[in-house]
């Protein structure tokens, strides 16, 4: 991306004129050589001004957000001690386990088609990543019985969740789970939960450690996508744990806040996963900008604008502008527009790290042509000038 220096041309020009001509006004006739030399100097300086104006400089890339500490499942850079790259082909293994007090009678092939949405799950990650990530899911069909009733297991604590996976792995002695990127276990009663820990808390397996795995009870490709994204480092965007302030402030605009309504991941998450190319995003920290912003699913154009709230070189919080993705179901009508939200890397999963700033309410959050956005929390103001035929929007952003 290219940027240009902004120079106060008029002020600089007037200073040059004043320094050249006013001192000469009384002695112009008898000091013509000196006058001539100053005139030439002035013209040279003016030309340098215009050369400087047109000289492009490399625009600043979006820096990693500063978490200001050790934050669990942050919107900042992924913890490399837990999470692997989110680029390339990923091998997944899907298992099926039940309990004596929760016996599963549905055929596991039918269950697989339901939870994967007949391929919708894999398609979602392929399309959202612009083809940069593919998921191959291998199945071990047939329900295998755990040794105790479901009531004796839990995924509510790290310890109980780890013990559950240790026993599940013991049910499959011939499988090398270290050969897989993501382990997915279908089971009733235990809920939908992702495990992700550093080695000291990870799942012990054959003298090594497995850092990520998930269990799923729901039959939904979007719920599975939500839990899989946890294995990739994303936090929950819905609120829990006694957090003060708004509940679920990200609304239905990302799978991590609403697997029931969202159709994909916010632009920030595509950026975090390194799916969104550098020329598709813009980082601005000052000035007035008139920009055309394209949908995230477009093949070109700037689709995400990021503005720092604090230190522009090492921010901990930013605001993001993008075009919203259409919601699923009955709420899809008029759900596409300019979406504004903040991302705070200091806040852990479930503690509102992403907040959408809606035009009306969270279901009607996007802004449309003629709308203005200003908020006391935001470092910028936005005018939505028009919507183009190609679904892009022309906006004006003024960064304070």
Regions found by a protein language model. Give the residues of each.
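Extracellular hydrolytic enzyme modules, especially secreted metalloproteases
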Residues: 177, 182-331
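Residues at the C-termini of beta-strands that transition into short coil/loop
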Residues: 98, 259-260, 344
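Zn2+-dependent metallopeptidase catalytic core
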Residues: 61-219, 223-225, 310, 383
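Sequence-level motif detector for i,i+2 pairs with an aromatic at +2
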Residues: 87-92, 130, 138-141, 180, ...
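Bacterial N-terminal signal peptides
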Residues: 40-52
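N-terminal secretory signal peptides that target proteins for export/translocation
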Residues: 1-34
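Non-catalytic C-terminal accessory/binding modules of secreted extracellular proteins
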Residues: 61-77, 105-106, 197-218, 288-400
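Boundary at the C-terminal end of the N-terminal hydrophobic targeting segment
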Residues: 54-59
